[in-house]
UniProtKB/Swiss-Prot annotation:
DNA-binding region: 19-46
Region (Disordered): 102-161, 180-218, 733-775
Molecular functions per Gene Ontology: DNA binding; DNA-binding transcription factor activity, RNA polymerase II-specific; zinc ion binding
Gene encoding the protein: yanR
Protein name: Transcription factor yanR
Gene Ontology annotations for the cellular component aspect, listed alphabetically: nucleus
Keywords attached to this entry: DNA-binding, Metal-binding, Nucleus, Transcription, Transcription regulation, Zinc
DNA-binding in keyword set: yes
Compartment annotation: Nucleus
């Protein structure tokens, strides 16, 4: 007898999470809020029904907002609190807290948020407001109402442990002893002195958990998911979870995208830790001075932030700090708290690169430089840890790591630097910086430009790391032709750029930026260098056609660089030998105090040392070259400067390095690195190499410049009896004419005895063919051209030894950057 059939199991009704339009059309809904991708594409009004599951009846019912009783006072505290929550979308600072962490703040106390400019001891006492004042419709809703505390729904994410690392407050930091290391340490949450802002207005970008572009009828080649909190995630076609036409479904495969709707908090950020970190900010005058130092000493070499936008956000942030007890934080800070990481990074870079003249100003003269740098470094690293940069990167945190890397990782070994660079490349790729699809049009012009600058900056780091270690680059060569080059315009004009930029005429002098010109030159050079390195690393023999292509590319690059150099404003007619008198008396840049703000850049990159090695090999291979005098002089200057950095105490502008010794963890500064020792040995071998009698005109000064791996002997300066054959000491002209430039320097300065002999009454100095001058005040941007020359020189040596020398240039002071 067959068994009786089992009774049909009654399934519990499921909650419908799709929007009404998709349910009516019977299509899969992406369930994005506030509008799904289907409704956006079809231009439909996307509406969701709020459904709940009744635990007692097992039924699913729609939730409707409760009516307001007529007898209730519309101005009462309950109505006012609920109304303020509705106006602000129900999003409060407590949304950044994890419900299961046990550290939900009690916002019933109306103590104001900490002001970075006021000492905790002098903070005003808490004040109570009347019910009528709280419910005044014309006033900003105060965030501190116990009835408006909203806690996030349980999440599948591991909750953030609010036992966060802390740093001292600014008042405590400036009183720390010199031997105190302001390192991150474990601490407990201090809720008594910090209160959270509630009910901030949510921006449109924050309301949308995912911003994507769907294309009717055609699958998108790639996909960029933009989430609240400025988090972006690039998803390529090779990803296993990407289905053509269903791109939004792949969002849920990434932890950074799950539960990222308006109702959920940013569980990966410790809001309490970030608020406590505000106590570590310097005062407003000190921050202003450090910001100016950043734009003066760091931004010209690394223009990775949009100046006008940064200054506007900076002013809005400090305006809120002055009124934090009655105003909401700026919208950008609410939507993207990683702005604090960028702020601390900029202040730390400004303090590290600030010249001695900046520390002598009124706002900084009372501070200890070493203590200030240590404190800001600790605050920056703590902010990066609180935001979990590696797991949830944003453009702010990525730019912060690029800006601070030269100061945090000084004198690191090439292999350690390689690991750091490879991690940075992968983070940039996960954010889609290596691609520019049709989805890039949804980004703002400023974001698109900063993404390009950051990507080409990373390309330069990767190619330098590849050359230093002999390993292949971390990216594919195809990415070099996908991302557009940096826009050749000032930051003030970036907002006016079109989405599809076409070739434009050369900007007028008033519309160009010297910092951007340098960035373009470095990016173009890095593009060619990476192609050469990638080709040499593929293991195949270089064919003649490939060599011809590389040589052609190098010549095109040289033309681009010449065009950029010609746009640098100049005074006089330097190509014909007419230069300002102050430039005729100029001393080497590294011996000039005006050079001190940019010393950090030279020791971060191996580019100049690689050029020295290439030139040394060239001199050994072609001892009878007509360029030997200029090449020998360049080598002597670089080795002199590099070796003296490690052995000669620097009590002026070199103090920047001494003050940053805390970042040289594990480095022995009194010992020359092995790579530099090898170059010094090669230099000594070159000097001791015997020469034939027919090379007497090429011989450098007889007083040999003696180097040893652990000692440095300064040479003897030239005398008035020094002479030189002008037929040897000549430079290629910027034009096709046969004119030559002869430089005369009368200012006494330490120099190497291996420098070329000069006519009577002059001293040694580097030749140059382009000089720029505005005034006699000195230049703080001269180093930019020299670094560009080194890269150009390196490219010329690698590809075409017969045309070794590019045009050395100098950039001038006081031009707008």
């Amino acid at each position: 007898m067959p068994p009786p059939p089992e009774p049909r199991q009654i399934k519990r009704p499921r909650l419908s999470l799709s929007c009404i339009v998709c349910r009516r059309r019977k299509v899969r809904c992406g369930r994005e809020h506030p509008e799904c991708a289907n409704c956006v594409r079809m231009k439909e009004n996307c509406v969701y029904k709020t459904m709940v599951h009744d635990e007692f009846t097992g039924r699913v019912r729609q939730v409707s907002p409760p009516p307001v009783p007529q007898g209730d006072n519309p101005n009462g505290p309950e109505f006012c609190a609920n109304n303020s929550e509705e106006r602000t979308g129900g999003f409060t600072w407590s949304h950044w807290m994890s419900q299961g962490s046990g550290n939900v703040l009690d916002l019933s106390d109306e103590a104001p948020l900490p002001r970075p400019t006021i000492s905790p001891a002098s903070a005003p006492p808490p004040q109570k407001r009347s019910t009528q004042a709280k419910c005044d419709a014309s006033s900003v809703p105060h965030p501190h109402h116990s009835s408006t505390i909203l806690t996030p729904a349980p999440s599948s994410h591991p909750q953030v442990d609010l036992v966060y690392p802390t740093v001292p407050s600014w008042e405590e930091a400036i009183q720390l002893p010199d031997n105190h290391h302001a390192s991150s340490r474990a601490g407990t949450s201090r809720t008594s002195s910090v209160s959270q802002d509630a009910s901030p207005a949510v921006s449109e970008s924050a309301r949308a958990p995912s911003t994507s572009t769907s294309y009717s009828g055609l699958p998108s080649p790639d996909y960029l998911s933009v989430r609240r909190g400025a988090r972006v995630r690039y998803i390529g076609q090779a990803f296993w979870g990407l289905v053509a036409g269903k791109e939004t479904l792949s969002d849920d495969f990434f932890d950074c995208n799950r539960d990222a709707s308006m109702e959920q908090s940013l569980t990966h950020i410790s809001s309490l830790g970030m608020f406590n970190l505000l106590r570590s900010l310097p005062t407003k005058p000190v921050s202003d001075a450090l910001l100016d130092a950043f734009f003066f000493a760091v931004w010209p070499l690394s223009p990775l932030v949009h100046g006008p936008t940064l200054r506007a956000d900076y002013d809005n942030f400090w305006e809120w700090c002055r009124n934090s007890d009655r105003a909401l934080p700026p919208e950008k800070v609410r939507d993207d708290p990683t702005f604090l990481c960028l702020l601390f990074a900029i202040l730390y870079c400004g303090a590290s690169a600030a010249p001695p003249t900046s520390w002598a100003c009124t706002n900084l003269q009372s501070l200890r430089k070493e203590t200030t740098i240590k404190h800001l470094k600790s605050a920056y690293t703590t902010s990066l840890s609180l935001c979990q940069h590696l797991e949830h990167p944003t453009l702010n945190t990525l730019v912060s790591t690029l800006l601070t890397a030269p100061f945090l990782d000084r004198d690191v070994a090439p292999m350690r630097n390689m690991v750091s660079v490879s991690t940075t490349v992968r983070i940039a790729q996960s954010m889609g910086l290596h691609r520019e699809g049709t989805w890039s049009s949804s980004l703002s012009p400023v974001d698109r430009e900063i993404r390009r600058r950051a990507w080409w900056y990373i390309i330069g780091l990767d190619v330098q790391s590849s050359i230093s270690t002999g390993l292949p680059p971390c990216y594919a060569t195809e990415a070099l032709d996908i991302v557009s080059m940096i826009a050749d315009t000032r930051d003030e004009d970036i907002g006016d750029l079109s989405n599809h930029r076409s070739p434009e005429p050369v900007p007028r002098p008033s519309e160009q930026s010297l910092a951007v010109i340098l960035a373009i030159a470095r990016s173009e050079t890095a593009r060619l260098q990476s192609k050469i390195v990638s080709r040499l690393q593929n293991g195949r023999r270089l064919a003649q056609t490939e060599l011809t292509e590389l040589v052609t590319s190098a010549k095109k690059l040289q033309q681009k660089l010449d065009t950029l150099i010609a746009r640098v404003p100049s005074q006089g007619i330097p190509e014909k030998g007419f230069i300002p008198s102050r430039l005729a008396k100029a001393s080497p840049l590294y011996q000039t105090p005006a050079f001190s703000p940019y010393v950090w850049f030279c020791y971060r990159h191996y580019g100049p040392l690689q050029c020295v090695f290439l030139i040394l090999v060239y001199l050994h291979t072609f001892p009878e070259s007509g360029d030997i005098v200029l090449a020998r002089y360049c080598i002597d200057e670089i080795i002199d400067h590099t070796v003296s950095h490690y052995q000669v105490p620097q009590d002026s502008f070199g103090a920047t390095r001494a003050d940053n010794s805390e970042s040289d963890e594990g480095a022995t500064e009194d010992q020359i690195p092995l790579a530099i020792q090898v170059l010094v040995d090669l230099h000594n071998r070159l000097q001791s190499h015997p020469r034939s009698d027919n090379q007497t005109t090429d011989r450098l000064d007889g007083n040999e410049y003696q180097f040893s791996p652990y000692s440095l002997e300064l040479g003897i300066q030239g005398t008035e009896e020094d002479t030189i054959d002008k037929s040897i000491f000549s430079l290629p002209s910027l034009s096709s004419s046969s004119s030559r430039t002869h430089i005369h320097r009368n200012q006494e300065a330490p120099s190497t005895t291996t420098a070329p002999q000069m006519p009577s009454g002059t001293k040694h100095g580097p030749p140059s063919s382009v000089f720029v001058a505005d005034s006699d005040g000195g230049s703080d941007l001269d180093i930019l051209a020299s670094l560009s020359d080194f890269e150009t020189w390196s490219s010329s040596l690698v590809v075409d030894p017969s045309d070794i020398l590019a045009h050395p240039t100098s950039m001038a002071p006081h031009h707008p950057v």
